[in-house]
From Swiss-Prot:
Gene3D superfamilies referenced in this protein's UniProt entry, alphabetically: GroEL, GroEL-like equatorial domain, TCP-1-like chaperonin intermediate domain
Record's subcellular location: Cytoplasm
GO biological process, one term: protein refolding
EC number: 5.6.1.7
Subunit architecture: Forms a cylinder of 14 subunits composed of two heptameric rings stacked back-to-back. Interacts with the co-chaperonin GroES.
Protein name stated in the entry: Chaperonin GroEL
Length: 544
């Protein structure tokens, strides 16, 4: 494939063109008065979106070089999304502003490498400043504010996420499902929940709701397939004497053993239910061990030299309550805090050590199941298009609240970055010189871009608003939805520090790369050759 090679100013200008196109498409969504973007889908209805990274992923340009610019800026958005889960539009607007400002200097003959060094130093200074200004999230009101701002000023959603976090803890899982009704609802399960239900419907204790509910049961946890009922008899006899129900969690229970359990259950001899173990392979064993720790029992496995037929009552787990439906099992246990805490710390260490994002996600799920329970938000909407938009907004809101809990909150609405601009200029003048100083000043000038854009989307003059904000104290800024200057914390317009920091770092990193570009190599589009004129009657329009 032949290549096109473009050098110097031409290369940078071509990248800039692509960056302009993407930044403009994404920037229209910024702020409380930001508009939506409609995306055409190859199949199904068009999607109406207000989420920066989703829009960025859809944009592909015909010109290969301009498309390279789009791909670079898209990276700033998706990296921010990966790190903080929100702030993608801010990252795009910032990167665009730094590139525009920087290219002017490079065109005027500045040394791009020194500019990059200045940009990097400025970014490090700003990250420290953001950390020092961040306030820890103390109460559910702050969490609700962060969630509401991220979901596009939907305070009902913010409150719902705050309630969910209250119930499942800061590390609990909040998952999203498409609901069946018009309203968005929150469903919380306390304790540990995994997605395997009873093996046979005959185990249901409540036939109307088709669920099995046991109070104060014993739990037999094993990674074996149970084929012979003789293996179970010693345990069943001990449990029957104790007069408490039994829940068996095993890899599988085969026909003969299952039939015996069902018959005993129906005759009222023994209150019992059997559930298949969750997960697969090594992960299954780890999850069974988690359940054993949670319930204060032992995993009966031949790896540890333990056999079913010699199992004693004190090796079984105990729970306050177990609810089993056809699809999932919820265990509410208590009294094993020390063991659970040790197990949680162990999983946390594994999360830190693992490189794979898939493993990280699965470990995070295990951590959440152990440490807090699960909240499910069922997203409701009138149409599928609205449902998809709400789901994306909710996802942003959940990510933003988790980020806020991690690193605290700062004034929102572009205010923090705008206030840091004069501080950066002051610091840079005192500590940097020459073109490094110019690099830091490029960042300082770009910092007001998100605030300007929020004001412009609200129909006002961005430059005037940003100058006014710079004169105010740090906690005060511009409330675009009510068109007034307010204390951002009091008004509840806050951003997670992690989101602001990630957006800034990723924007500066990508922009610095664009400024130091001196040559672009892209594929040359191949002209399609038409068939020769005499290629059969009426066949000349086909490509060969």
């Amino acid at each position: 494939m032949a290549k096109r090679i473009i050098y110097n100013e031409n290369a940078r200008r071509a990248l800039e063109k692509g960056i302009d196109i993407l930044a403009e498409a994404v920037a229209v969504t910024l702020g409380p008065k930001g508009r939506n973007v409609v995306l055409e889908k190859k199949f199904g209805a068009p999607q109406i979106i207000n989420d920066g990274v989703t829009i960025a992923k859809e944009i592909e340009l015909e010109d290969h070089i301009e498309n390279t610019g789009v791909a670079l800026i898209r990276q700033a958005a998706s990296k921010t999304n990966d790190a903080a889960g929100d702030g993608t539009t801010t990252a795009t607007v910032l990167a665009h502003a730094v590139v525009k400002e920087g290219l002017r200097n490079v065109a005027a003959g500045a040394n791009a490498i020194l500019l990059k060094r200045g940009i990097d130093k400025a970014t490090n200074f700003l990250v420290e400043q953001i950390k020092s200004h961040a306030r820890p999230v103390e109460d559910s009101k702050s969490i609700a504010q962060v969630g509401a701002i991220s979901a596009g000023n939907d305070f009902e959603v913010g409150q719902m996420i705050a309630d969910a976090m209250d119930k499942v803890g800061k590390e609990g899982v909040i998952s999203l499902e498409e609901g069946k009704s018009m309203t968005t609802e929150l469903e919380v399960t306390e304790g540990m929940r995994f997605d395997k239900g009873y093996i046979s419907p005959y185990f249901a204790t409540d036939t109307e709701r088709m669920e099995a509910v046991f109070d104060e049961p014993f739990i037999l946890i094993t990674d074996k397939k149970i084929g012979l009922v003789q293996d179970l008899v010693p345990v069943l006899e001990q449990v029957a004497r104790a007069g408490r129900p039994l829940v068996i969690i095993a890899e599988d229970i085969e026909k003969e053993a299952l039939a015996t359990l069902v018959v005993n259950r129906l005759r009222g001899v023994l209150n019992v239910a059997a559930v298949k173990a969750p997960g697969f392979g090594d992960r299954r064993k780890a999850m069974l061990e988690d359940i054993a720790v949670l319930t204060g029992g032992q995993l009966i496995t031949e790896d540890a030299g333990l056999k079913l037929d010699t199992t004693k009552l004190d090796q079984l787990g105990k729970a306050r309550r177990i609810t089993i439906t056809k699809d999932n099992t919820t265990i509410v246990a208590e009294g094993n805090e020390a063991a659970v805490k040790a197990r949680v710390d162990q999983i946390r260490r594994q999360i830190e050590e693992t490189e794979s994002s898939y493993d990280k996600e699965k470990l995070q799920e295990r951590l959440a199941k152990l440490s807090g329970g699960v909240a499910v938000v069922k997203v409701g909407a009138a149409t599928e298009t609205e449902m998809k938009d709400r789901k994306l907004r909710l996802e942003d809101a959940i990510n933003a609240t988790k980020a806020a809990v991690e690193e605290g909150i700062v004034p929102g609405g572009g205010t923090t970055l705008a206030h840091l601009a004069p501080q950066l200029e002051e610091w840079a003048t005192a500590n940097l010189s020459g073109e490094e100083l110019t690099g830091a000043q490029i960042v300082a000038r770009a910092l007001t871009a998100p605030l300007k854009r929020i004001a412009e989307n609200a129909g006002l003059n961005g430059a005037v608003i940003s100058e006014r904000v710079k004169e105010l104290p740090f906690d005060e800024g511009y409330d675009a939805s009510n068109n007034q200057f307010v204390n951002m914390f009091t008004a509840g317009i806050v951003d997670p520090a992690k989101v602001t920091r990630s957006a800034l770092q990723n924007a500066a990193s990508i922009a610095a790369m664009v400024l130091t570009t001196e040559c672009i190599v892209v594929d040359k589009p191949e002209p399609k050759e038409k068939a020769p004129a005499g290629a059969g009657g009426g066949m000349g329009d086909f490509d060969y």
